[in-house]
Amino acid sequence: MPGVLLDRAALIARVKDHVSRELPPEAIRDEGLALQLFGFIPTKFDYEAAEYALLQDQLAGYYEPADGTMYMAGDLGDEEAEATLAHELVHALQDQRWNLQERSKYRPGEGDHSEVVSALAEGDATSAMFDVMIARAAPGTGKTAVDLPDDVFAEQIRAGMNDGPGAGAPHVMRTSLAAPYIYGTLFVHALRRRGGWDAVNRAWDDPPTTTEQILHLDKWLAREPAMAVTAPTFAALGAGWKVADEDSEGELGARIAFEEWMEPKAAADASGGWGGDRGVLVTSGDKAAFAWRVRYDAGKTKDDRAARAYATVTRGLDKTLGPAKVSDPAFVCRERADRGPFALARAGADVVFALGPVSTSASGWASAGDCAQSRKWVRELVGAR
């Protein structure tokens, strides 16, 4: 396999070229717009440029399936270069045996599945890389990556994302970038503890289908599928609106979102029990809105997991955003001057988010709705489950 050393700028240029070939530009734009509607990133913010800046800070190398070449940063020290080489060689082997290039292709509306592929690929490569690093640091001990406690490993990855120039990136971007490395590796470690690398190979042969299965090994062992969830409708917004993007975020996406409003453990609890979800970004001229329906598995009763998640998210929003303008037992809403209304509701096993509408004109963002309209929209959403 050929290898090429590049400076950081040239390495990122290669990544940009790869992304431009694999991902339509509107996919990146729509992802950023949804994050802005949630309030996770500023309204005046170049999301794509910020993503590449964060990558430039973190990226040491990458394997390009299109030409079978490994590209590495030329400024790495010996230890970092050895670790990066080990990591990227695993990606090359994944491509040779399981056609990583085909599995990694962008598929509209299958965001959760894309995260599964990323988590399995990065978890496999990161686990092997840590084997190499531990063997170098503690030769002759026989220790491997699976001897690291899960919380210690996860904290090492998070610390790497929170240091250096990338530490200034919005929290949601850093946690999203770290997620496949953390949770994918924990999944791989769980497999290795059960059956060694053969168990990991079996996961490639019969891969997880949801990030819920990545986060909970027992869900993969049981082959528990995602529930079918219909896409949110938006007639309550009026005429002229159209779908810009429709996707599933998965349990991992829900956990990452909830961490913006609460501590990680609470976010894990609130997203646990995820059964399925569907979100839709809609636009009308320069106006935008987003709705997201998250359906929960049954617990002791049919709806108790959704009820607990709703209560936890409501408390998180109260703490982060302040008191709601409207607060009913199953509906809360805040009016935001620069992002439009933010409504949260629960109906049965569903927790529903309705964000916007908001005007996104170049002169500045401004609300284009209110909580009365949001209540109508939520009634439409819970009536069309």
Annotate each predicted stretch with a short phrase.
Residues M1-S20, P108-D112, T144-E155, D206-T210:
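Acidic helix-start/capping segments at beta-turn-to-alpha-helix junctions
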Residues A10-E26, D46-D67:
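Catalytic zinc-binding patch centered on the HExxH motif and its immediate surroundings
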Residues H18, Y62, A73, A92-Q96, ...:
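Structured segments of extracytoplasmic/periplasmic soluble domains
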Residues G68-A86, H113-V117:
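Short pre-active-site segment immediately N-terminal to the catalytic Zn-binding motif
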Residues A83-L100, A125-T126, V188, A298:
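Active-site recognition of the HExxH zinc-binding catalytic motif
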Residues D95-Q101, K105-A154:
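Post-HExxH zinc-binding segment in Zn-dependent metallohydrolases
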Residues M161-D286:
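Pan-zinc metallopeptidase signature
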Residues A270, G275-R385:
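C-terminal soluble interaction/assembly domains
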